[in-house]
Amino acid sequence: MESEHAERVADGASHLWKDFMKTTPELCAKEASPCSCVTGYKSKILRWNRVEAPLDMSNDISGCFLFPYKKKESCNMVNFKENEELKTLNHSCAHLMAQAIKHLYPQAKFWVGPVVAEGFYYDVDLGEDVIRDEDIEKIEKEMKKIAKSGKKIMRREVSKAEAMEMFKNDEYKLDLISDLEDGNITVYDQGDFTDLCRGPHVDNVKLCRNFKLIRHSGAYWKGDSKNKVLQRIYGVCFPTAEELEAHLKLLEEAKERDHRKIGKDMNLFMVDDLVGRGLPMFLPKGYVIWQELENYIKNKERKLGYLHVMTPCVGTVNLYKTSGHWDHYKENMFPPMEMEGESFVLRPMNCPHHMMIYANRRHSYKDLPIRIGEIAHDFRYESSGTLKGIERGRHFCQNDAHLFVTPEQIEDEFTKVVDLIFSTYKDFGITNYRCVLSLRDPANKEKYHDDDAMWNKAEDALRTVLNDLKIDYTEEIGEAAFYGPKLDVNVQPAVGNEITLSTCQLDFCLPAKFNLSYVDRDGEKKTPVVLHRAILGSLDRFMAYILEETKGNLPTWLAPVQVRVMPVKTDNEELTAYAKEICDALEAKDVRVELDDRSEKLGYRMREGQVQKVPYLLVVGFNEKEDRTVSFRLHGEKDTTVLPLDEFVEKLENEIKNKLRTHIGAEK
């Protein structure tokens, strides 16, 4: 399924540089994602020293945002959307950071410094120098010094020849300038620093004084792994110190919710460079969660008539040439393996295999819909800068399915898929999501299957269902799969950019490429339509999201260890014997239970159980043994509850069987 792992991200994304110098300021502001924490942004510290007049974007004076206005040009920035003001501030702060870096590293050369969801960044080539953690403080100190100077930020229009001369020793800027048209090139001056940029910017560096550089990493130039690795430094800027402080607190909270930290603390998965970057390995406890997710979704699908299959992780190059993926997706695939005169590739998706399963036998209209599902292992060569734990890797497992339907069944089957998505979200308590109808860009004939009638029909079909179901959604041009439009359900993880959890894609293209058919009621051969869908998306990514949403405080049915039993005195045979009896009673009901009878202090064992996010911590003392009770504490709670052993076992069995969310999210 093409949408899986396909959303645009800031790290390593090549789309940013292509349009960076060509877009108008209003489009730049539109495209840059706002920070999620500034919804209530009310600051008026940004001062717009311009003529008060209605802002009219239709007059093609986009250069007037914060520029020395020309005759008859004026802007009313007071009415401009507040988050757009914040983006402008962050973009200006990127220039402030670049100026500071240039002061400290005179050899520095800069690529681009856009605004992204988490603030801003700038890619820089420092030659032999490498930015380390201790250097960040030095850069911040220089930035504060420059901001305090109160230098004005001024826009200048220059000719292409002037720009080439101005940046003649900077191959990165020359590369940008080469794509620009003469008469449409601007630079910004602030004191002794000049940068090539379309803007917009605030008019004084002192407005950028409330900033923080938050991290640094490597990034390929233009997002291409064949190019040099530049140093990328991220930062964030706010109009007031109070807003900055609040945001930094949110960042600290986000770090605690990062699934990579939780996975390490709970011993769930690991990544090792010797195995390969982007190739996570699930440890025993992590694999328990993975299996529970697999069983959960397969059981739901079986009740809806899905037929589960297993297909190989490789296929011939010819298979992907037939499907069209070789032409449209080759750059995201691992290179071919040549063996005995055949070329094989690790599969990046499962559609071609499922097409061949359908083609294995003849079908009548009476057979349709046919719903083929699989928990499938897929491989995609993601750039190293985009890799992120189990949320985004080079190997992942998709909860994939392909529904083969007649044209008359499209809307009904699409409705059932949408219902399945939202019933699943209800089970997991997922409420904060955004629905996106991804459409083709009609002007891009190379990216998409060229059939206007097919596209119009497919897009209208999905719109109809979404409107009938009264689902709020936005449309995004140019984000469809190459073979058809799709519905993506996106969520915001604790760290990083928005991700896609679920997707449903409508496809008139692949069935024809594979010559699939069914016999209709008139005895004529017809081509089926295919719905590609993934409810959990990839199990890896879904697991990462749930870990972050719950801070690892999983519902009991999903927890790798559901109960930990701890005798107060580990050297007392009677207490240890009763603790083992409790474990036996729970194991008989398929409860995942651990006996912790190590010769450690009880407080130490309790704290370890809390770090491991075990839902039920049971303490066995002499009172519990005599009364045949259990004394337990739910994770995230301080109160202790005492129940008879049989009653506790029954309670826990019911909670797990019915997948109750008794304590999920208690640490939120």
Model-based region annotation:
Residues S3-R8, L27:
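Cationic, low-complexity basic patches in intrinsically disordered or flexible, solvent-exposed regions
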Residues F20, Y41, F65-Y69:
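Aromatic (phenylalanine/tyrosine) cluster motif
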Residues C28, C35-C37, C64:
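Cysteine-centered motifs
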Residues F20, K70-W111, V115-G119, D123-K668:
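NTP/phosphate- and nucleic-acid-binding module
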Residues A13-S14, A32-S33, E52-S62:
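Intrinsically disordered, low-complexity segments enriched in serine/proline and basic residues
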